[in-house]
Swiss-Prot record:
<feature type="disulfide bond">
    <location>
        <begin position="37"/>
        <end position="50"/>
    </location>
</feature>
<dbReference type="InterPro" id="IPR001368">
    <property type="entry name" value="TNFR/NGFR_Cys_rich_reg"/>
</dbReference>
<feature type="repeat" description="TNFR-Cys 1">
    <location>
        <begin position="36"/>
        <end position="73"/>
    </location>
</feature>
<keyword id="KW-0426">Late protein</keyword>
<feature type="disulfide bond">
    <location>
        <begin position="54"/>
        <end position="72"/>
    </location>
</feature>
<feature type="repeat" description="TNFR-Cys 2; truncated">
    <location>
        <begin position="74"/>
        <end position="103"/>
    </location>
</feature>
<protein>
    <recommendedName>
        <fullName>Truncated secreted TNF-receptor-like protein A53R</fullName>
    </recommendedName>
</protein>
<keyword id="KW-1015">Disulfide bond</keyword>
<keyword id="KW-0677">Repeat</keyword>
<comment type="similarity">
    <text>Belongs to the poxviridae A53R protein family.</text>
</comment>
<dbReference type="Pfam" id="PF00020">
    <property type="entry name" value="TNFR_c6"/>
</dbReference>
<feature type="disulfide bond">
    <location>
        <begin position="51"/>
        <end position="64"/>
    </location>
</feature>
Length: 103
């Protein structure tokens, strides 16, 4: 177990998402073990496969289908996501609650 000092958890999470989504980790889906998946993934119950969640600032352009993983795309200008997500939509900044925005 690695213990991180205050403020380094965000860095570790950022590196995890970078490796997981951009270097090629998680490129393919895999069968869920005991109905659970790794951090940054979700269980697609239709196929019993572990699939990538899109990182904050991106949305699912194409959901995983049992063979190919989720295809994420950056949110368009003036929209956002704040959490790893599997939705195929983003939130318009004009409709956002003020406490949801990062300035």
């Amino acid at each position: 177990m690695i213990i991180l000092k205050d403020g380094y958890k965000e860095f570790a999470d950022c590196m995890y998402y970078f490796l997981h989504y951009y270097i090629g980790y998680g490129r393919y889906t895999y069968s869920a073990t005991n109905g659970s998946c790794d951090k940054g993934e979700y269980l697609d119950k239709r196929h019993n496969q572990c699939c990538n969640r899109c990182p904050p600032g991106e949305f699912a352009k194409v959901r995983c289908n049992g063979n190919d993983n989720t295809k994420c795309e950056r949110c368009p200008p003036h929209t956002y996501t704040t959490i790893p997500i599997i939705l195929m939509d983003v939130i318009n900044v004009e409709n956002a609650q003020p406490d949801h925005l990062i300035r």
